[in-house]
């Protein structure tokens, strides 16, 4: 959705959709953004939700000089970004969303901060409405490594887990800074060579984790033999504040592409109506991973937008990146990139040149994203 108006350098949007995209791009471009009529028609709970306010507070912590104006009802916000500072910080995330909701913003902004980012986030590590920390560790960080080239200082560590609804988890995210991101041409996804996974169980019987592992491995061993799933059984303070269990599977290809899928059990309130069965959970996550592999491309479908961001901000050379069918979220992100950076992409369906290549890209129709980077330079980074 294009901005409804533009006052000087300030972009004006309407509605609550894609708030995180707009705030991230505002921080990177330095352009102020005003968003009005945020759930103004919702009579019971108009305005920004608590998790959205928590995200704005996090962006305020990693920047220096940011100005935020909220109207009393919370239905309008004016966000004037400052310089990305980074450094060491702690943040208690709202438990209405998983930590993955906030980590997405840190991964996008981290390489362009003044100081290397070392962030401790507390909240829900595994939830249904946000990518889990295991998903991000497997899919998003592997993508970021391709653009950083040297991944020294890049780390995502799970200190303790916490599932919905009460959370209680904690993670530490470290990200190095770069002067600029390199242009990249990545058009080969390779063949899946191994599958790794993590099953966690918090305040429930260890048998739940073992049954989930058996069901997931039963599906995946039909396709390849190299399947290993690690069991993470937590007790006491290390298991957060709520009971639950879940699983994350990561498929790695011969070219280093990672596809991920995760699934978690229902909360205690939801389990009263529909209890979670470990065998069904294991089978569901296996099918989700197979669907992700079928989509294909050189990036997990959840992080197509991140690949688009990095190649758009790269050096002034042609970058090409192969993805699966574009998600709705990625399509809107490309539109927002045009609004903030005036950059457009060339999107085309690649055609195989020979039969061998056609077999390698078997699966869903692929999309080749191509653009000339804007040559974004990290002005915040110290130059010695």
From Swiss-Prot:
Transmembrane ranges? none
Q: Which CDD domains match?
A: RNA_Cyclase_Class_I
Q: Which GO terms describe its molecular function?
A: RNA endonuclease activity
Q: What is its main location?
A: nucleus
**Which UniProt keywords are listed?**
Nucleus, Ribosome biogenesis
- InterPro entries per UniProt: RNA3'-term_phos_cycl_insert (IPR013791), RNA3'_phos_cyclase_dom (IPR023797), RNA3'_phos_cyclase_dom_sf (IPR037136), RNA3'_term_phos_cyc (IPR000228), RNA3'_term_phos_cyc_type_2 (IPR016443), RNA3'_term_phos_cycl-like_CS (IPR020719), RNA3'P_cycl/enolpyr_Trfase_a/b (IPR013792), RPTC_insert (IPR036553)
Name its cellular compartments: Nucleus, Nucleolus
Nucleus is among the record's keywords: yes
Please give the biological process terms from Gene Ontology that the record holds.
endonucleolytic cleavage of tricistronic rRNA transcript (SSU-rRNA, 5.8S rRNA, LSU-rRNA); ribosomal small subunit biogenesis
Q: Which residues form a coiled coil?
A: none
One Pfam family, short name please? Answer: RTC_insert
Any one GO cellular component localisation term in the record: nucleolus
Q: Which PANTHER family match?
A: RNA 3' TERMINAL PHOSPHATE CYCLASE (PTHR11096), RNA 3'-TERMINAL PHOSPHATE CYCLASE-LIKE PROTEIN (PTHR11096:SF1)
Query: Which family does the record assign?
Result: Belongs to the RNA 3'-terminal cyclase family. Type 2 subfamily.
Q: What quaternary structure, including any partners, is listed in this protein's UniProt entry?
A: Part of the small subunit (SSU) processome, composed of more than 70 proteins and the RNA chaperone small nucleolar RNA (snoRNA) U3.
Function (record text) = Part of the small subunit (SSU) processome, first precursor of the small eukaryotic ribosomal subunit. During the assembly of the SSU processome in the nucleolus, many ribosome biogenesis factors, an RNA chaperone and ribosomal proteins associate with the nascent pre-rRNA and work in concert to generate RNA folding, modifications, rearrangements and cleavage as well as targeted degradation of pre-ribosomal RNA by the RNA exosome. Does not have cyclase activity.
The protein in question is named Probable RNA 3'-terminal phosphate cyclase-like protein
The organism of origin for this protein: Drosophila melanogaster (Fruit fly)
């Amino acid at each position: 959705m294009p901005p409804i108006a533009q006052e000087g350098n300030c972009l004006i949007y309407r509605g609550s959709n894609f708030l995180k995209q707009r705030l991230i791009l505002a921080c990177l471009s330095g352009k102020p953004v005003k968003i009005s009529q945020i759930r103004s028609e919702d009579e019971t709970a108009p305005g920004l939700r608590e998790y959205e306010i928590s995200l704005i507070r996090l962006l305020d912590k990693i920047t220096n000089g940011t100005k935020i104006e909220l109207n009393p009802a919370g239905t309008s916000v004016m966000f004037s970004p400052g310089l990305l500072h980074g450094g060491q910080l702690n943040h208690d995330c709202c438990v209405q969303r998983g930590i993955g909701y906030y980590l997405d913003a840190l991964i996008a902004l981290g390489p362009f901060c003044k100081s290397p980012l070392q962030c401790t986030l507390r909240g829900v590590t595994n939830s249904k409405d946000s990518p889990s920390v295991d998903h991000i560790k497997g899919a998003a960080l592997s993508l970021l490594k391709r653009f950083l080239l040297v991944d020294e200082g890049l780390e995502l560590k799970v200190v303790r887990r916490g599932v919905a609804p009460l959370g209680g988890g904690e993670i530490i995210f470290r990200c190095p800074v770069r002067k600029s991101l390199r242009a990249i041409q990545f058009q080969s996804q390779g063949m899946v060579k191994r599958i790794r996974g993590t099953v966690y169980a918090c305040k429930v019987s260890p048998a739940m984790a073992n049954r989930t592992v058996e069901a997931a491995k039963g599906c995946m061993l039909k396709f390849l033999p190299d399947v290993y799933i690690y069991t993470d059984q937590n007790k006491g303070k290390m298991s957060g504040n709520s009971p639950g269990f879940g699983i994350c599977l990561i498929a790695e290809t011969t070219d280093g592409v990672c596809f991920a899928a995760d699934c978690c059990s229902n909360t205690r309130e939801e389990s009263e109506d529909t209890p979670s069965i470990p065998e069904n959970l294991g089978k569901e996550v296996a099918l989700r991973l197979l669907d992700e592999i079928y989509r294909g491309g050189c990036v997990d479908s959840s992080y197509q937008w991140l690949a688009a961001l990095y190649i758009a901000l790269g050096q002034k050379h042609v970058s090409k990146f192969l993805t699966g069918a574009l998600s709705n979220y990625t399509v809107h992100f490309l539109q927002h990139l045009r609004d903030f950076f005036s950059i457009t992409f060339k999107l085309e369906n690649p055609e195989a040149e020979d039969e061998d290549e056609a077999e390698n890209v078997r699966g869903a129709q692929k999309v080749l994203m191509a653009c000339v980077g804007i040559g974004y330079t990290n002005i915040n980074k110290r130059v010695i």
